[in-house]
Amino acid sequence: MRLIPLKSASQVGLWSARYIVDRINGFKPTADRPFVLGLPTGGTPLNTYKRLIELHKAGEVSFEHVATFNMDEYVGLPEDHPESYHSFMHNNFFCHIDIRPENINILNGNAEDLVAECKRYEDKIKSYGKINLFMGGVGNDGHIAFNEPASSLSSRTRVKTLTEDTRIANSRFFGGDMEQVPKLALTVGVGTLMDAEEIMILVTGHGKAQALQAAVEGSVNHMWTISTLQLHPKGMMVCDEPSTMELKVKTVRYFQQLEAANIGRL
């Protein structure tokens, strides 16, 4: 597993955006052979989306032949609700780039049959062959997407009950009122993520330090679903300095030396 230790959250956004642009351009996507990109929501990727929009407007990348799959969506929120992940993605990314609407894939949390919706999503991913690059974030408790602690490490897209910790953390988007935060969500599974050709996880802030430590220095453990990244042949974590505070000094130095050339590209 790769670890890219940077100074700030801003640098994490810039580095990850440039990495995505390089992967898309290197792939040379076409209408018949699109680049398939997995995407998260939340506060952490906002810097990345901002930088991707800037790079797109500067003419450095086109999303015309990029297909996207989002990680998750709340159950029961209307798509046009300001805190739905449909709204988040359109407001913070999709409406600013040249992606084709038919290439955007987000789970439908209002489907009549949620189990069937999850199967449909898995089948749609398989129809593309695989996700080329899945970008994600991590929760304070180490969850990826909505794969909460004790999730199966081979899980597929499914309905999940959100933990109280996750609902408290997300209540900041609902005016601080946890009762407004949905109790259920649809989420890709850990196994779904692991099927991607490459996974890039963004980690920023001291609040994520324990999760980063568990992912990098701990053992693979279903209580820290992020730790599964250790088993991926092309897993990578891009982090800022505050998030590394629980790592051993020698661990950080090791990756600083190992990734010096890549870090220097900023």
Swiss-Prot record:
| Gene3D superfamilies xrefs | 3.40.50.1360
Site residues by UniProt (Part of the allosteric site): 151, 158, 160-161, 254
- Which NCBIfam families does this one have? nagB, PRK00443.1-5
Q: What is this protein called?
A: Glucosamine-6-phosphate deaminase
Q: Origin, by domain of life?
A: Bacteria
Reactions accelerated catalytically: alpha-D-glucosamine 6-phosphate + H2O = beta-D-fructose 6-phosphate + NH4(+)
Q: What is its EC number?
A: 3.5.99.6
Task: Tell me a GO cellular component.
Answer: cytoplasm
Activity control summary: Allosterically activated by N-acetylglucosamine 6-phosphate (GlcNAc6P).
Q: How does it assemble?
A: Homohexamer.
Q: Which GO terms describe its biological process?
A: carbohydrate metabolic process; glucosamine catabolic process; N-acetylglucosamine catabolic process; N-acetylneuraminate catabolic process
Family the entry assigns: Belongs to the glucosamine/galactosamine-6-phosphate isomerase family. NagB subfamily.
Q: What does this protein do?
A: Catalyzes the reversible isomerization-deamination of glucosamine 6-phosphate (GlcN6P) to form fructose 6-phosphate (Fru6P) and ammonium ion.
Specify the pathway. Answer: Amino-sugar metabolism; N-acetylneuraminate degradation; D-fructose 6-phosphate from N-acetylneuraminate: step 5/5
Family annotation (PANTHER family): GLUCOSAMINE-6-PHOSPHATE ISOMERASE
Work out whether the entry's keyword set contains Hydrolase. yes
Q: Which GO terms describe its molecular function?
A: glucosamine-6-phosphate deaminase activity; identical protein binding
